Regions:
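N-terminal Rossmann-like FAD-binding beta1-loop-alpha1 element of flavoenzymes
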Residues: 26-57, 245, 253, 257
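Short hydrophobic core segments
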Residues: 34-36, 59, 165-177
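A conserved FAD-binding loop/helix module that cradles the flavin
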Residues: 229-264
Length: 276
């Protein structure tokens, strides 16, 4: 390996970033599936959707991904996974340590890194620093047809800047406790009769069962997984046990596949080409 770095002019750096980023934005402006939120459910959902051949993009409001994984339990760097969700982590070569029969612990940093790598390697495009500000919809028949996106920094600054639209056959709300996409739709498209009452207090075993049960289609074109499902159906929170989150992501990928099979051509299962 060369020890001397090749020089790159400042304008070449700028031009490379603009041109390559613009090329990718132009590509995923029409996607098959938009996953909102790069937490455990969102990363798992995107990984399987991309594996199934769908053109999948994740929009994440932060400049990092992992959602609630990074905080572990009260910032201790471990969390709990129960079977059969450990199989998802094993697929991405994330180590799990047995605790009791069917119960495991995992390292937060490794879980974030391996899940994200799994989604990216499957073909998902993760775009950080983007907030979903609204949705696109049509009324004949009534359905959600995409997401309206904005830079997170613009919304934080309170600037009046018009957002842009990204089309998809399915938008999946994986934004966690706040159920951000569902909250927007409940406010702006009242004819869908969506109400987001928020989650109940902690009851881990029941929370895991109900969240997984309620993962699914909310209305045509709009889906929910992870803690957003708890917020929508007012079921308990579960704390730092993540098996249900991972299985919820896998389930919503299967639900979207079943619903969109006739709408979206099945793509060849291969990795998206790396940008040179």
């Amino acid at each position: 390996m060369r020890s001397k770095l090749r020089e790159v002019d400042e304008t070449d750096i700028t031009r490379a970033i603009f041109s390559r980023a613009a090329r990718e934005w132009a590509d995923f402006t029409e996607s098959d599936v938009i996953v909102v939120g790069a937490g455990p459910a969102g990363l798992a959902a995107a990984m399987y959707l991309a594996r199934y051949g769908f053109k999948t993009v994740i929009f994440e409001r932060r400049l990092s991904f992992g959602g609630g994984i990074g905080g572990g339990g009260m910032m201790f760097h471990k969390l709990v996974i129960q079977s059969p969700a450990d199989e998802i982590l094993r697929e991405v070569k994330c180590k799990v340590e047995p605790l009791t029969e069917g119960v495991f612990t995992a390292d937060t940093a490794e879980m974030i890194a391996k899940l994200a790598a799994g989604a990216i390697d499957a073909g998902t495009k993760i775009v950080p620093g983007i907030v979903v500000d609204d949705v696109m919809f049509r009324d004949t028949p009534l359905r959600v047809t995409g997401a309206v996106v904005q830079w997170t920094s613009v919304t934080m600054a309170g600037l009046h800047v018009d957002p842009l639209g990204v089309k998809a056959q399915a938008v999946v709300d994986c934004t966690g406790h706040d159920a951000e996409v569902l909250a927007i739709v409940s406010r702006k498209i009242p004819e869908l009769n969506i109400v987001v009452p928020g989650e109940k207090s902690m009851w881990s075993p029941e929370a895991e069962k109900l969240m997984l049960k309620n993962t699914g289609e909310v209305c045509p074109g709009l889906y929910v997984a992870g803690m957003a499902a708890a917020a929508l159906y007012q079921t308990p929170r579960m704390g730092p046990v993540f098996g249900g989150m991972l299985l919820s992501g896998k389930k919503i990928a299967d639900v979207v596949t079943e619903k969109c099979r006739a709408l979206v051509p099945r793509r060849k299962q291969s990795r998206r080409s790396n940008v040179a």
